[in-house]
Amino acid sequence: MALKRSNFFVDKDQQLKDNLILDITDLHVNFKVKDGILHAVRGIDLKVERGSIVGIVGESGSGKSVSVKSIIGFNDNAQTKAKLMNFKNVDITKLKKHQWKYYRGTYVSYISQDPLFSLNPTMTIGKQVKEAIYVASKRRYFQAKSDLKFALSNKEIDKKTYKSKLKEIKQTYQQKIKPINVEKKTLEILQFIGINDAKKRLKAFPSEFSGGMRQRIVIAIAVATEPDLIIADEPTTALDVTIQAKVLTLIKQLRDLLNITIIFISHNISLIANFCDFVYVMYAGKIVEQGLVEEIFTNPLHPYTWALISSIPEQKDKNKPLTSIPGVIPNMLTPPKGDAFASRNQYALAIDFEYHPPFFEVTKTHKAATWLLHPQAPKVEPPQAVIDNITLTKKALQFKDQ
């Protein structure tokens, strides 16, 4: 079985441009709960370039995970609406529940924050990696046949080309699922992710590995399917700092080697700074600032971004008290009027409590939704902690370029 993708192709004027792999417009995700409607995501746009690492950062409850789970149909009982969710020129808003399986785990892989719940405790790790290879290969084979048949019926190719390509597809599939080739690929992946004595460990169960190693195995399964996109949803939260660094380095190496696109979710803005190419800052179900990682950390513009950066522990003065953001995220059953961050924002203007700010564009890639960027707004300097961080970031970037 395969998904008849021709039924889900976007219109010609909506086709992806500029090396994009994902384009989401005006995404809303609501949940019907006992006390009413929970407005988890409130009209966000996301653009993701092929081969990039895109970070989404914000406090717990800001809507990060819900946003990306909508890309793989993981939000059970959610009311999801969007003007467009274009993944590789397929509008995934049109997919029915039973159709998600043709994309999930094949074209898009998901890495959760707790590897213990991602792995089957009754199956060896070798069997789990091999299963991912077999299932993804089979789905890609049937999908390729379906797409080829569509091309023939649409007169994009002639019968001779159809037969030739069909034979090629079948031969490729048969080679991929040969047990000897699956075993070889499994060993190569496990060795690459740092599993010592991989051939022997193929028969080991998840419980025989540490938390860091289990997360590496989850990454191995995600990569084994040869996806175009990997969603890493706080994949290092349950790991200690040294293991975090190793796992992030591994993910980056896989991106560079396989040209996989990665969406990285975190509440830790310092991880985002060291790992991502492009950043979306999210608060109360909305994007409040976005830009290249260099722009966000050398010229942060939204007070919420300032607050996140200010909360990074001071490296030089270890006796300096930690900075925290006062207050809590508002109740999304009844989202506040105006800017949702206004009640926690010491720089808030009167207009913030009445009207939500539009995006003010600073560069083609950098923009922020704050009234402080309005031409008539008073000039406000960011906190000293942010200014210090900007100085350090600029020095680090200069050193990196040398």
Curated annotation (Swiss-Prot):
GO terms for cellular component: plasma membrane. ATP binds at residues 58-65. GO terms for molecular function: ATP binding; ATP hydrolysis activity. It is a peripheral membrane protein. Keywords: ATP-binding, Cell membrane, Membrane, Nucleotide-binding, Peptide transport, Protein transport, Translocase, Transport. The keyword Metal-binding does not apply. Its EC number is 7.4.2.6. The keyword GTP-binding does not apply. Transmembrane segments: none annotated. InterPro entries: AAA+_ATPase, ABC_Ni/Peptide_Import, ABC_transporter-like_ATP-bd, ABC_transporter-like_CS, Oligopep_ABC_C, P-loop_NTPase. It is an enzyme of class 7 (translocase). CDD domains: ABC_NikE_OppD_transporters. It is found in: Cell membrane. It catalyses: a [peptide](out) + ATP + H2O = a [peptide](in) + ADP + phosphate + H(+). Pfam families: ABC_tran, oligo_HPY. GO terms for biological process: peptide transport; protein transport. Residues 22-309 form the ABC transporter domain. Part of the ABC transporter complex OppABCDF involved in the uptake of oligopeptides. Probably responsible for energy coupling to the transport system. The complex is composed of two ATP-binding proteins (OppD and OppF), two transmembrane proteins (OppB and OppC) and a solute-binding protein (OppA). Belongs to the ABC transporter superfamily. NCBIfam families: oligo_HPY (TIGR01727). This is Oligopeptide transport ATP-binding protein OppD. It comes from Mycoplasma genitalium (strain ATCC 33530 / DSM 19775 / NCTC 10195 / G37) (Mycoplasmoides genitalium).
